[in-house]
Curated annotation (Swiss-Prot):
Protein purpose: Binds to 23S rRNA. Forms part of two intersubunit bridges in the 70S ribosome.
Family affiliation: Belongs to the universal ribosomal protein uL14 family.
Gene Ontology molecular function: any one: structural constituent of ribosome
Bridged cysteine pairs (disulfide): none
Subunit and partners: Part of the 50S ribosomal subunit. Forms a cluster with proteins L3 and L24e, part of which may contact the 16S rRNA in 2 intersubunit bridges.
An example Gene Ontology biological process: translation
Lineage summary: Archaea, Methanobacteriati, Methanobacteriota, Stenosarchaea group, Halobacteria
PANTHER family: 50S/60S RIBOSOMAL PROTEIN L14/L23, LARGE RIBOSOMAL SUBUNIT PROTEIN UL14
Protein name, entry field: Large ribosomal subunit protein uL14
One Pfam family cited in the UniProt record for this chain: Ribosomal_L14
Residue stretches spanning the membrane: none
Keyword set includes RNA-binding: yes
Length: 132
């Protein structure tokens, strides 16, 4: 996994409800854990743009509900700072469900994805229609 160019402020913590931006049948996801996070004692685990997280499906089709899956954060409301000084933030917090090879399980993505995510996950970038 590559390092990100931008200074990503982590805007999601464990327990956050986020939207699912693909067509797998899930509509709302709950963050249950963040892979690779090592924090301080008593600190809430946080995730940001381009992080791989474990989620539980809270709303969606009956086949998808209550499943525990892996996902990648593609949008967050909290602004991130790019090397040229610009700040980017999105209207919602969203993630894409991925498989064990970090390929998206859905065939299409709804809405834009951040350029930082496209650099780190090429398979998600090839599925996306808008890269900001």
């Amino acid at each position: 996994m590559e390092a990100l160019n931008a200074d990503v402020t982590q805007g999601l913590e464990k327990g956050s409800l986020i939207t699912c931006a693909d067509n797998t049948g899930a509509r709302e996801l709950k963050v249950t854990s963040i892979s690779g996070y090592s924090g301080t004692k008593n600190r809430h685990p946080k995730a940001g743009l381009g992080d791989k997280i474990t989620v539980s499906v809270t709303k969606g089709t009956p086949e998808m509900r209550r499943q525990v899956l892996e996902a990648v954060v593609i949008r967050q409301r909290k602004p991130i700072r790019r090397p040229d000084g610009t700040r980017v933030k999105f209207e919602d917090n969203a993630a894409v469900i991925v498989d064990e090879n970090e390929d998206p399980r859905g065939t299409e993505l709804k809405g834009p994805i951040a350029r930082e995510v496209a650099e780190r996950f090429g398979s998600i970038a090839s599925t996306a229609t808008i890269i900001v």
